[in-house]
Amino acid sequence: MRTLIIVLSFIVVLPVWADGHLSTEKTVMQLVMDHWEARDNNDYETQADLMSSTGTYNANSDGSFFRYSGNVSADDLENSMGGQSSSLNVKYPETISLSDDVVLSRYYLEGVISDDGGTVNNYRTRVTHIWVKEKSGWKTKSWHFSPLHDGGRHITSSSDFEED
């Protein structure tokens, strides 16, 4: 009986180890954290390096339409985001390997964002973030931000953060 349990355990666990999902998902999870740390530190070079060289597909939390952004340089990011400051926290991150070269990450992002137009003290959004493996490593290919204010229909409570 003991031998049967051990054999069945290997049958269930071995495919996950064999295809590298665990290490891939951990790698991408760290890149998510690295990106937002770079954002908070105005490290445009790191942010640009984490973007796909063939561009990204984006939908921002400001309600703008889906858009494509071509290859973005550190200078481009500084020109568009210079003067902003942020203190953002990634909450409840998950990474899911969809194939050998595509990983879905999803998480909540909350914190404070400021620019010349003012400060958002309660920035909260959901992020669906697609990473692809390119020659130079894992890169952001697409992301969608959806604000968590939900039109006033939902009041956040502690149960929103409880595990099932």
Regions found by a protein language model. Give the residues of each.
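Short, cysteine-centered beta-strand-loop-beta hairpins and adjacent loop/turn segments enriched
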Residues: G83, G111-N121, H149
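Short, low-complexity N-terminal intrinsically disordered segments enriched in polar/charged residues
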Residues: V16-L50, S158-D164
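Bacterial N-terminal signal peptides
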Residues: I5-P15
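N-terminal hydrophobic targeting signals that begin at the initiator methionine
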Residues: M1-R2
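A solvent-exposed, acidic/Ser-Thr-rich amphipathic alpha-helical stretch
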Residues: L22, K26-T27, D43-D101, Y107, ...
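A short, structured loop/turn motif at beta-sheet edges
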Residues: T95-L104, G118-T119, W131-K139
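Short beta-strand segments enriched in hydrophobic/aromatic residues
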Residues: M51, L109-G111, H144-P147
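Low-complexity, intrinsically disordered terminal/linker segments enriched in charged
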Residues: T125, K133-E134, K141-D164
